[in-house]
Amino acid sequence: MARRPGSSSRGPARPDRLAPQAVTSARRPQTPDKSPKPASPDPSLVLLGEFGRPHGLHGEVRLKSFTGEPLAIAGYGPLHASDGRTLELEDARPAPGGSPDLLIVRVKGVDNRSGAEALNRITLAIARERLGQAEDEDEFFLTDLIGLAVEDPSGTVIGTIVAVPNYGGGDLLEIRPAAGGPTALLPFTKAFVPTLDLAGGKVVADPPEDLFAPPGPKPADDPG
């Protein structure tokens, strides 16, 4: 979960403080999460993790957990996989020498390396309705941000949030400009997004002037 920020960063893009069978919501965080994936594009689902490479020969696989308590992901029973399957984790443990959110897991029905290889880059999500309501008015799911209007400090609508990706350096807001054209990415920090008004269906952003500027021309090839 995420919480309204009290610092320069809005932190984890994933549910925080999750406990088996008792996930609540996302907190507007204090520190950034380094999860590589955006919030689930389906607002009825909340992203919990992403599979990586196989581990060993007997079906185990690496999993990046997006939950505040990484091992909690194994306690939610059947989960929605991005390839359309329903998958259930049977076992999870911290990956040796890895970051705290990197796990070695076993998936029910997967007992060999080829099955584990087929899981690589597949994400796991949970139905939002299974998570209950936020316990704190400052808590929310990052999927709640998708569809919000983006206003500049003067109150002019400059775009709409279409995704909340995280490529390793902190959460980003992908914004479709109101004037049309390609989307742009804005760091989801208090400096760039000082106001978040879920009830009002908007955020107030203070973006750089060139946020929606087209990329400059590529430098000419060196004739030498």
Curated annotation (Swiss-Prot):
Pfam families assigned to the protein according to its UniProt record, in alphabetical order: PRC_RimM, RimM
Lineage: superkingdom: Bacteria
Region Disordered: start-end pairs: 1-46, 204-224
MF (Gene Ontology): ribosome binding
Intrachain disulfide bonds: none
Record bears the keyword Iron: no
Domain PRC barrel: 137-211
One Gene Ontology term from the biological process aspect of the record: rRNA processing
Gene Ontology, cellular component aspect: cytoplasm; ribosome
Location in the cell: Cytoplasm
UniProt keyword Cytoplasm present: yes
Low complexity biased stretches: 1-12
InterPro entries cross-referenced by the UniProt entry: PRC_barrel-like_sf, PRC_RimM, RimM, RimM_N, RimM_N_sf, Transl_B-barrel_sf
Keywords annotated in UniProt: Chaperone, Cytoplasm, Ribosome biogenesis, rRNA processing
Primary subcellular site in the record, as a coarse category: cytoplasm
Gene3D superfamilies (alphabetical): PRC-barrel domain (2.30.30.240), RimM (2.40.30.60)
Biological function: An accessory protein needed during the final step in the assembly of 30S ribosomal subunit, possibly for assembly of the head region. Essential for efficient processing of 16S rRNA. May be needed both before and after RbfA during the maturation of 16S rRNA. It has affinity for free ribosomal 30S subunits but not for 70S ribosomes.
Domain notes: The PRC barrel domain binds ribosomal protein uS19.
Family: Belongs to the RimM family.
Complex and partners: Binds ribosomal protein uS19.
Record-given protein name: Ribosome maturation factor RimM
Organism listed in the record: Methylorubrum populi (strain ATCC BAA-705 / NCIMB 13946 / BJ001) (Methylobacterium populi)
